[in-house]
Amino acid sequence: MDLLSLRTAIQSTLNSVLGTYTLANGATTPAISVRAPGESLPAGTTVSGLEVVIVREPELVPVRQYKNEQAFSRWTLYLVDWAGTNSLQDVAGDLLWAYPGSNAVSINVPRGVGPRSQMRVDITTNPETHV
């Protein structure tokens, strides 16, 4: 699965709970983005509600087989609740149901600063064969 397909599928799965990005020009868009580690949102962009951040590059997990090398792609997502109104366990559950073999872990966040809660979700997609 490529990055665009994954992003589209996740947005479709979580559409009813996604928050909103408000861009510097006032336009709004669903709060789902693809970023490299350490990359931030464009200047002037604000977030409200549930944000989903997909890490741009997947981790490759090798599967050893006779005469074929395969690798699962493990995509990392961060669910970030900026409003404190979402149950991240329920949101992560929707993703785990849609992508069997995936897992989710809560991340501690400082109280009173930034997001209310955060989870990391690792989604594993089908292997690609490399001969």
What are these regions (language model features)?
Residues G38, V61, L79, V105-I107:
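Generic preference for well-ordered secondary structure
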Residues K67-G84, S117-V131:
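Oligomerization/assembly interface segments of phage tail-like spikes and tubes
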